[in-house]
Amino acid sequence: MQIILLDKVVNLGNLGEVVRVKDGYARNFLIPSGRARRATASAKQEFEAKRAELEKAAAAKLAESQTVGEKLAGTTCKLTQKAGVDGRLFGSVTNADIAEELTKTGFKVTKAQIRMPNGPIKVVGDSKVSVALHTDVLVEITVSVYGETA
């Protein structure tokens, strides 16, 4: 199925590009989430009429993400979990825990934006975690996990 991208999509294309994707990906994800539209003649004309306003909105979203990223860069997120004497946690620190803690400190971050390359944190100490605020804005933060003896 050919679609017009209404937003930048990672590994697919930028705003305004006409790309070919599998039908299920378009129907079940891209179109319902508002990131794309079927590439019909009328849709192309409508898109060209709205192109400037969509590009302006995308630029504003990017600028906002960059300002939040500058504030968030280098931030340390402190979490306390129950741990054994050897420093291993009973359970783990997930992206949901980190997102909740960042939200408490005043940043609007969802768990889907937290990138944990090594999976959940299972030991006490400091770990580096990335936060993807926008497709072009990736910020690295430090997560400090403190052990609480059970």
Curated annotation (Swiss-Prot):
GO terms for cellular component: ribonucleoprotein complex; ribosome. It comes from the Bacteria. It holds the Pfam family Ribosomal_L9_C. PROSITE patterns: RIBOSOMAL_L9. One of its GO terms (molecular function) is structural constituent of ribosome. InterPro entries: Ribosomal_bL9, Ribosomal_bL9/RNase_H1_N, Ribosomal_bL9_bac/chp, Ribosomal_bL9_C, Ribosomal_bL9_C_sf, Ribosomal_bL9_N, Ribosomal_bL9_N_sf. Keywords: Ribonucleoprotein, Ribosomal protein, RNA-binding, rRNA-binding. Binds to the 23S rRNA. This is Large ribosomal subunit protein bL9. The gene is rplI.
